[in-house]
Amino acid sequence: MNLKQEVESRKTFAIISHPDAGKTTLTEKLLYFSGAIREAGTVKGKKTGKFATSDWMKVEQERGISVTSSVMQFDYDDYKINILDTPGHEDFSEDTYRTLMAVDSAVMVIDCAKGIEPQTLKLFKVCKMRGIPIFTFINKLDRVGKEPFELLDEIEETLNIETYPMNWPIGMGQSFFGIIDRKSKTIEPFRDEENILHLNDDFELEEDHAITNDSAFEQAIEELMLVEEAGEAFDNDALLSGDLTPVFFGSALANFGVQNFLNAYVDFAPMPNARQTKEDVEVSPFDDSFSGFIFKIQANMDPKHRDRIAFMRVVSGAFERGMDVTLQRTNKKQKITRSTSFMADDKETVNHAVAGDIIGLYDTGNYQIGDTLVGGKQTYSFQDLPQFTPEIFMKVSAKNVMKQKHFHKGIEQLVQEGAIQYYKTLHTNQIILGAVGQLQFEVFEHRMKNEYNVDVVMEPVGRKIARWIENEDQITDKMNTSRSILVKDRYDDLVFLFENEFATRWFEEKFLEIKLYSLL
């Protein structure tokens, strides 16, 4: 297989949803249908002691939520699929955002009873901004929920995107019979003891079956005929531009509708796309020269070995283990001898990868999020990955002063992962951490204790707003007021931490010469 054929066989996507919509369950069932795992149903293991393949961190297993982005790779038909299971908890939207910079499409999971929820909307907007094609899986049809038309209208009105239902449900909850596939005009029954049924062109059942006397069946046929009469054909170009989402109904927990979705996904999802550089060069996935960028760093995937893995998206060319690459930020060459692929916490050595693949590089502290690696004589760098402005700030210190070495090592590694942001006061060198949500601090505290054996003391600093400074040379000591703290971030850039919006406006009006700005 040549490079072009290899690249065209790659499909790389992230799954986005509100917590508890069934995102991790769908991830696991996709792995099950691909043959990547032998046992389905290992999600939601709080009582059984089983844990989702993608939820590998101890805190995730204990709390039943995803707080890191897991990467899983598997083969299906003639395709190699890279799937990223993103954090479902809203406090980890920063990590999710960076993950969405590394994929070519997204799958949006919606709970049929709840419809569009806040986290779904937030993540959808990121996808829309990037023009990422979005597939929709409406989950939990075996429970009572909103009517199909109501759900489609909600998606279109709330998200401002056209919908195209690929299948249609017959009933829901206890009366859920199955789904009608629009293309094949077949009915896939929910219960295993039932056989597949067929409809003719007039939507009449070809077999004799008691379902014809069921009001849920009659309603589904009437609704489907209305959809068909609307006459809108599936528009693949609209999908690829992010203006239309194909919609699939099913139940991930019951393994129902998942394989239909997977079959359609590999047919319609885009192959790896081109990427823009800071130099305004478009790098094609078919370029012979290797390039890639780091979008995530994870410490202690194996706590026994205190390892650090940098997650890299291959953008162009072919990666070969042992090759020499240049880290553009430092302009230093390095030989990559340790590279890995993932099935959550299961890792195996990668000798070869092409555009679209996500691989892990063992990191001794060389990499930062957003780093570009290139082969050959290339000199470009990919655009920086966005950072969120924190909204909660805490002073942090080690409870035991004898643990300072472990404390600083833990801070350094966890900050480099990008899940929490680091600041230091100018004169006292007090460490202040910033986060977009409270859960990040809880996870930070948990990981410091369990991975670095350090108990930490955290104290709120009473500041809610961070603003960076365009013209640092004009900052003076008199600007450090009782309602603001002047600190440096991990890059030694000056940052004001303000008490509230009023304090921010007061500062801007009093010191007109200072230009403040925020991150995302």
UniProtKB/Swiss-Prot annotation:
Subcellular location: Cytoplasm
Domain of life: Bacteria
UniProt record, GO biological process: regulation of translational termination
Binding residues for GTP: 17-24, 85-89, 139-142
GO CC annotation: cytosol
Coiled-coil intervals, chain numbering: none
Entry-linked PROSITE patterns: G_TR_1, G_TR_2
PANTHER family to which the protein is assigned, alphabetical: PEPTIDE CHAIN RELEASE FACTOR RF3 (PTHR43556:SF2)
Family: Belongs to the TRAFAC class translation factor GTPase superfamily. Classic translation factor GTPase family. PrfC subfamily.
Purpose of the protein: Increases the formation of ribosomal termination complexes and stimulates activities of RF-1 and RF-2. It binds guanine nucleotides and has strong preference for UGA stop codons. It may interact directly with the ribosome. The stimulation of RF-1 and RF-2 is significantly reduced by GTP and GDP, but not by GMP.
Name listed for the protein in its UniProt record: Peptide chain release factor 3
The species this protein was found in: Staphylococcus aureus (strain JH9)
